[in-house]
Curated annotation (Swiss-Prot):
GN (gene name): lpxD
SUPFAM superfamilies, per the entry: Trimeric LpxA-like enzymes
Assembly and oligomerization: Homotrimer.
Function: Catalyzes the N-acylation of UDP-3-O-acylglucosamine using 3-hydroxyacyl-ACP as the acyl donor. Is involved in the biosynthesis of lipid A, a phosphorylated glycolipid that anchors the lipopolysaccharide to the outer membrane of the cell.
HAMAP family named among the record's database cross-references: LpxD
Protein name: UDP-3-O-acylglucosamine N-acyltransferase
Catalytic activity, reaction form: a UDP-3-O-[(3R)-3-hydroxyacyl]-alpha-D-glucosamine + a (3R)-hydroxyacyl-[ACP] = a UDP-2-N,3-O-bis[(3R)-3-hydroxyacyl]-alpha-D-glucosamine + holo-[ACP] + H(+)
Broadest EC class assigned to this enzyme: transferase
């Protein structure tokens, strides 16, 4: 598949500077791109790579400085434009409408004729698979679960009983939707067997709304009662844990190894960077940003940016980190002052 640069510009709404008739055959990073590849440049850190690149065309921001003779495609959002161009060369997987004979489909399950179910997948009683959805090997869709249209379920995904997955959802390998929430009541008697943690039935479900992507080995626990919910357009990275009854608003970004404890609610467009930990029963407002490894122990107001453990306003955290770097020097200065003070005291005590 090839496109002229002018065709690409019309597709993404960019402005060509240079040869619009250039034939583009693929996408590549700046360092590896050749004369018929398109790459992108939006971070000044990679300025030298941009200048040295052999790429036939580079997608840049509107105000980027362009080396002489360089063909570029100016776009208001270079990364987004490049992503759209890359999709043209690497379109989403299309379903091959069939049910593999090695798949296990319960007679009461409803699989749309345009869906694809690959070998060793299993679809349980009363489960529903929507139009054009692709179910890879090893996927288990349990009893009464519903999966919408145009979804992509990669190998070894598990969707537990009665859980709901919307349209255009991507579930990466090994993720689990609707595993039991972590709920136990301590029983000191244990009905004659000694003290024990009595399992609280997790009778609710998990709901994944439209246009969500969930990364590999992420776990979305079902609710104790009601629903755990992942809002429309939210993207969740690998190895994320959402506890029972957590609610994520639309368009959140949850980066790898984040853990969110039960019944916490996140608003719209919240960003949790890697390894953020959030305790249960909190409210995190719209547009909140949480820096990597932050420990969130209280509610966060809409629009705030927080960092550190326990989390504090990001500007305060930066100041505290700057002060922390000065501690070795301050410690030496204090020791010198203490020695000087001791000398002064000794001299004063020795006078008649």
């Amino acid at each position: 598949m090839t496109f002229t640069l002018a065709e690409l510009a019309s597709r993404v709404g960019g402005e060509v500077v240079g040869d619009g008739a250039l034939v583009v055959e693929g996408v590549a990073p700046l360092e590896d791109a050749g004369p018929h590849d398109v790459s992108f440049f939006s971070n000044r850190k990679y300025r030298k790579a941009f200048e040295a690149s052999r790429a036939g065309v580079v997608v840049v921001e509107p105000d980027a400085e362009i080396p002489a003779g360089r063909t570029v495609l100016r776009a208001r959002n270079a990364y987004l434009a490049f992503a759209k161009i890359s999709t043209l060369f690497h379109p989403p997987q299309e379903p091959l409408p069939e049910i593999a004979p090695e798949a296990v489909i319960h007679p009461s399950a409803r699989v749309h004729p345009s869906a694809q179910v690959m070998p060793l997948a299993s679809i349980g009683p009363d489960a529903v698979i929507g139009a054009r959805t692709i179910v890879h090997p090893g996927v288990h869709v349990c009893e009464g679960a519903r999966v919408g249209e145009d979804c992509l379920l990669y190998p070894n995904v598990v969707i537990r009983e009665r859980c709901v997955v919307g349209n255009r959802v991507i579930l990466q390998p090994g993720c689990v939707i609707g595993s039991d929430g972590f709920g136990f009541a301590f029983d000191p008697d244990g009905e004659g067997h000694g003290p024990r943690h009595f399992k609280v039935p997790q009778a609710g479900i998990a709901v994944v709304e439209d246009d969500v992507e969930i990364g590999a080995n992420a776990c979305i626990d079902r609710a104790t009662l009601g629903a755990t919910r992942v809002g429309r357009g939210t993207k969740i990275d690998n190895l994320v844990q959402l506890g029972h009854n957590v609610e994520l608003g639309p368009l959140c970004l949850i980066v790898a190894q984040v853990g969110i404890a039960g019944s916490t609610k996140l608003g719209m467009g919240v960003v949790a960077a890697g390894q953020v930990g959030i305790i249960g029963h909190l409210n995190i407002g719209d547009g909140v940003k949480m820096g990597a490894q932050s420990g969130i122990a209280g509610d966060v107001a809409a629009g705030d940016t927080v960092s550190g453990t326990p989390a504090q306003p990001h500007a305060d955290w930066l100041r505290s980190q700057a002060a922390l770097r000065q501690l070795p020097d301050l410690r030496r200065e204090v020791k010198e002052l203490r020695r000087e003070l001791d000398r002064l005291r000794a001299g004063k005590e020795g006078k008649p």
